[in-house]
């Protein structure tokens, strides 16, 4: 409990409020007793628990709170008492006639606890015989076993009269202050997000005809509260709603109740309803309820989804919407009792739709806050005492049950619920998830859609679109209207992008401080990497006694005889060497690393092969002469090979630095292990391409090779970052792709993507012309055999998709919320070149992927800082897309040569995904940009951040000079993913390697493709003018 932060001011104000009111409660109690034992998660809405949350913001188990005239006493343990010290001091300075005392009890000292209990009973007895308690509260635990016998005996001994104070407590915390309103608003916003998730899952299940029960779907949504990936998406929006001095915390989010999903012909509109085990019925009405609480303040929302509804259902639902509007705007007024409101609503129904009055619910809601349903203030025909006040918060929930559709003769129900706060300027709905008829109606049977479309098709186009003008903006009136709509969409998109860029700039300034700048500018801090050849002289090989140069492979050492002594030089100290023959002698020159030498270590290399200290002395080179040319050649070859092996080993070590050792896979030894047979894997641990099987175990999945038992791939659920299903629609294979958080080893290879696939088509083509169909030279299109073959292939593809999707869902289900399945949206895809070849890139819910051709592309959208559309110029047929990540050390991702036809779509898609983008007419030099950004990110955002990219965003087709676009130098090279920003990854790499000369040589050979395209376009225009 060390992290508890109790609002002392609120605690004091609320204690004084309750202390001043409790004598006015029904039956006028002389004192109040609140005993809380162990926490009861099964019933979190008891009055004593609510009191703890209202006063302290937390539940203090094993605590006794007693209110008496002039004094409030809290008996609790020592650790809990420490958190109340600040409050005690506040009461001492200004008690307003109320004293607060904290009595500490020791859990191990039973006698001391009993003495405290007897003292508090004596204090209660002094106050009077009438004692107020929440009668329905029931708690258990060790504390209650100690307190209950003593309290029961005291009741008999002192003849205490116990009275229920629940109604009085309800009225005390009825009106919400600003902080409470903020907490309920956050909870309501979160309920909207979960309702959106629930509706997506429900519609997908109905559309795909999945066999899933109402309770199973409910559990799936309920588990999302533990999905940090999902919760992080809503964190920024919810943080902005927090009251002053309160930081949004995901741990304070919890379910008010388990999500409720009802379908079929059994409906329960009471708040105590729950999801049953019947199959989700994809026709008629589906009722869905979600309730989230934040910091223990509840919210609620219920929606009715209409699946292929009849006209009667739609009309009744429209009336339900009108009725809710009438209740909130006209009936929910301060000063009215619950009975007055309810009876007025019933009269309205009888007047407008009398046939529905008998199906109306028995109440239209209740107070909501620390309790989901305050039973002492329900808006029904019985509540004629409590009056509505400004500051009240209600769960307005009502509907019509046991309705019968005349068309289908089936039962259905309609229900709506929203969280509503009553402000001084009127009621405000806090749960804003859509409920309009068009948004909650889904037509999977096209007959109804066609009926609705036919009248619309016959609608006349107005002959005058611009007032009385007969001159139209376009030859076609429809075009003019379309242009107007497109301009409006463009304006909305630009406004959204402006807000996204402003948000990006603010977050950048908050994320980085002046201390984030590298202290040494662009220079990387270098250090000496220690190495050692031998610890003791006895470890030196015996064959060095011949005083010749030797190579010790085991110790990675060159042993050179100097003045009759073997001197070891570790291979890390060796730089390069040369061998020359002059006359009868062969000269072997060995060069060693040393500070200040020509062609030395780059400043970007972190690990130095020497200790650069002014106290150290270095040998830069040594030359050996021998008449035995063959031995010198052999020795030089051994030294060269040892250096290559050492360099290779060091590169492998750096490459595997981010590989994390996985826990062991726990095999499923109980029950039936789910498996997917006849699949192939990429990359494969085997040299031969053979079909195999993947199994789902307790904490992960395992691919088992059929060739060798020790050849397998184990993937833990905790290491899966993205689980993606790609249908075989439009492709030759169906895929389950797994993108990992941390790379794993497959043999000696590091892999971060594993893909299971199966070929979707096994149709063979008869190329000999001897088939029965080929005998008829002039056969008609639509030959029966051909049609049958096509239908069979479509059926196989559908079965294949269903099998792989089911297995992907099984993986997600087995992970217990750690993993969720994403599906690719082919309709939103576009062509591009992320690597060497043109591929089709497709988005999922959270990613942009290319899963057909290796190397695969998986870009997580939540990791993107900004997107840049490069080479957007008039006349060019394609452009490039660059993603910059929030982790500035991560290399940027390029998708090149995207057709210009996809430009508008990508702009809108990036905006919809809340990704700010900028437009450039040239390719920027990203290595320079990212290097300067990493040096001082705080200064980067102080200078405007990514605003330099927007210099040319407004006029996409302008021919501005490169200097006007960016302060950074433009690159004429083909952009590549920068895997590092240094020119030398290893100090041992030879300068004369020539591996970096390719780009320069390409520039010298001739013009690039952009220039050639411009010339070709110019030539075409010239030819057109001549014609």
Curated annotation (Swiss-Prot):
SMART domains: FACT-Spt16_Nlob, Rtt106, SPT16
Record carries keyword Transcription regulation: yes
Coiled coil location: 8-28, 82-102, 208-233, 484-507, 637-658
UniProt keyword terms in alphabetical order: Chromosome, Coiled coil, DNA damage, DNA repair, DNA replication, Nucleus, Transcription, Transcription regulation
Any GO MF annotation of the entry: nucleosome binding
Acidic residues bias: start-end ranges: 953-992, 1000-1011
Subcellular location: Nucleus; Chromosome
Annotated spans, Disordered: 767-790, 952-1027
Complex and partners: Forms a stable heterodimer with POB3. The SPT16-POB3 dimer weakly associates with multiple molecules of NHP6 to form the FACT complex.
Purpose of the protein: Component of the FACT complex, a general chromatin factor that acts to reorganize nucleosomes. The FACT complex is involved in multiple processes that require DNA as a template such as mRNA elongation, DNA replication and DNA repair. During transcription elongation the FACT complex acts as a histone chaperone that both destabilizes and restores nucleosomal structure.
Name of this chain's protein: FACT complex subunit SPT16
Taxonomic lineage: Eukaryota, Fungi, Dikarya, Ascomycota, Saccharomycotina
């Amino acid at each position: 409990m060390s992290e508890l932060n109790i609002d002392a001011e609120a605690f004091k104000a609320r204690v004084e409020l309750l202390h001043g009111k409790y004598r006015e409660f029904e039956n006028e109690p002389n004192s109040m007793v609140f005993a809380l034992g162990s926490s009861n998660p099964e019933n979190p809405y008891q009055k004593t628990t609510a009191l703890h949350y209202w006063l302290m913001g937390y539940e203090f188990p094993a605590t006794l709170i007693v209110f008496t005239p002039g004094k409030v006493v809290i008996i609790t343990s020592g650790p809990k008492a420490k958190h109340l010290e600040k409050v005690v001091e506040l009461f001492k300075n200004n008690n307003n006639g109320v004293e607060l005392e904290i009595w500490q009890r020791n859990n191990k000292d039973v006698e001391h606890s009993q003495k405290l209990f007897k003292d508090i009973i004596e204090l209660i007895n002094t106050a009077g015989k009438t004692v107020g308690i929440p009668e329905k509260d029931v708690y258990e635990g060790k504390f209650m076993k100690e307190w209950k016998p003593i309290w029961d005996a005291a009741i008999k001994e002192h003849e205490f009269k116990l009275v229920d104070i629940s109604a009085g407590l309800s009225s005390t915390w009825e009106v919400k202050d600003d902080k409470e309103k903020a907490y309920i608003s956050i909870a309501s916003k979160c309920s909207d997000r979960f309702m959106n998730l629930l509706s997506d899952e429900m519609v997908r299940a109905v559309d795909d005809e999945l066999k899933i029960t109402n309770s199973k779907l409910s559990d799936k949504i309920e588990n999302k509260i533990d999905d940090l990936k999902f919760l992080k998406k809503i964190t920024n929006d919810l943080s902005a709603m927090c009251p002053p001095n309160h930081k949004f915390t995901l741990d304070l989010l919890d379910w008010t109740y388990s999500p409720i999903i009802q379908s079929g012909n059994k409906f329960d509109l009471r708040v105590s309803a729950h999801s049953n085990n019947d199959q989700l019925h994809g026709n008629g009405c589906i009722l869905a309820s979600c309730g989230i609480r934040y910091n223990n303040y509840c919210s609620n929302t219920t929606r009715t989804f209409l699946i292929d509804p009849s006209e009667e259902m739609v009309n009744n639902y429209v009336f339900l919407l009108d009725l809710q509007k009438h209740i909130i705007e006209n009936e929910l007024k301060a000063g009215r009792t619950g009975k007055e409101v309810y009876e007025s609503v019933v009269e309205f129904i009888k007047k407008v739709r009398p046939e529905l009055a008998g199906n109306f619910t028995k109440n239209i809601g209740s107070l909501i806050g620390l309790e989901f349903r305050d039973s002492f203030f329900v808006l029904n025909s019985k509540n004629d005492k409590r009056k509505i006040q400004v500051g009240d918060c209600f769960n307005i929930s009502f509907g019509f049950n046991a309705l019968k559709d005349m068309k289908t003769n089936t039962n259905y129900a309609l229900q709506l619920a929203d969280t509503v706060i009553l402000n001084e300027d009127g009621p405000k709905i806090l749960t804003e998830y859509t409920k309009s008829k068009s948004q909650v109606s889904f037509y999977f049977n096209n007959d109804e859609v066609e009926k609705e479309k036919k009248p619309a098709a016959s609608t006349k186009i107005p002959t005058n679109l611009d007032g009385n003008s007969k001159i139209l903006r376009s030859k076609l009136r429809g075009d003019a209207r379309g242009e107007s709509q497109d301009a409006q969409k463009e304006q909305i998109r630009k406004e959204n992008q402006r807000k996204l860029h402003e948000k990006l700039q603010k977050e950048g300034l908050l994320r980085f401080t002046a201390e984030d700048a590298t202290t040494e500018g662009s220079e990387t801090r270098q250090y000496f990497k220690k190495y050692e050849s031998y610890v003791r002289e006895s470890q030196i090989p015996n064959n060095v006694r011949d005083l010749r140069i030797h190579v010790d492979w085991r110790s990675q050492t060159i042993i050179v005889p100097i003045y009759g002594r073997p001197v070891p030089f570790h291979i890390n100290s060796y730089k390069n060497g040369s061998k020359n023959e002059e006359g009868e002698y062969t000269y072997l020159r060995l060069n060693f690393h040393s500070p200040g030498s020509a062609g030395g270590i780059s400043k970007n290399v972190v690990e130095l092969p020497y200790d650069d200290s002014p106290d150290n002395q270095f040998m830069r080179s040594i030359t050996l002469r021998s008449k035995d040319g063959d031995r010198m050649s052999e020795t030089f070859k051994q030294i060269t090979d040892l250096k290559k092996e050492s360099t290779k080993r060091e590169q492998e070590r750096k490459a595997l630095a981010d590989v994390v050792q996985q826990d062991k896979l726990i095999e499923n030894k109980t029950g039936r292990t789910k498996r997917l047979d006849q699949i192939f894997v990429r990359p494969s641990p085997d040299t031969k391409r053979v079909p195999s099987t993947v199994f789902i175990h307790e904490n992960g999945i395992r691919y088992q090779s059929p060739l060798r038992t020790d050849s397998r791939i184990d993937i833990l659920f905790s290491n899966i970052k993205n689980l993606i299903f790609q249908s075989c629609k439009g492709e030759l294979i169906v895929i389950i792709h797994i993108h990992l958080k941390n790379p794993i080893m497959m043999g000696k290879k590091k892999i971060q993507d594993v893909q299971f696939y199966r070929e979707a088509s096994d149709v063979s083509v008869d190329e000999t012309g001897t088939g029965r169909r080929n005998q008829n030279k002039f056969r008609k299109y639509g030959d029966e055999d051909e049609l049958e073959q096509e239908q069979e292939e479509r059926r196989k593809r559908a079965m294949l998709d269903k099998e792989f999707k089911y297995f992907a869902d099984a993986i997600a289900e087995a992970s217990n919320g750690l993993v969720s399945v994403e599906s690719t949206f082919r309709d939103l895809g576009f062509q591009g070149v992320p690597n060497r070849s043109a591929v089709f890139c497709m988005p999922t819910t959270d990613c942009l992927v290319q899963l057909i051709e290796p190397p695969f592309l998986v870009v997580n959208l939540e990791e993107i800082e900004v997107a840049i559309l490069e080479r957007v110029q008039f006349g060019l047929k394609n452009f490039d897309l660059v993603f910059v990540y929030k982790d500035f050390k991560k290399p940027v991702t390029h998708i090149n040569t995207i057709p210009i036809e996809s430009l508008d779509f990508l702009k809108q898609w990036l905006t919809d995904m809340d990704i700010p983008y900028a437009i450039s007419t040239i390719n920027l030099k990203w290595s320079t940009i990212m290097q300067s950004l990493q040096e001082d990110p705080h200064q980067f955002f102080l200078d405007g951040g990514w605003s330099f990219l927007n210099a040319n965003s407004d006029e996409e087709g302008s021919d501005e000079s490169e200097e006007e676009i960016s302060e950074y130098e433009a690159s004429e090279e083909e952009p590549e993913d920068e895997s590092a920003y240094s020119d030398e990854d290893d100090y041992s790499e030879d300068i004369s390697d020539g591996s970096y000369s390719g780009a320069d040589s390409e520039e010298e050979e001739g013009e690039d493709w952009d220039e050639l395209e411009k010339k070709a376009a110019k030539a075409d225009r010239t030819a057109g003018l001549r014609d």
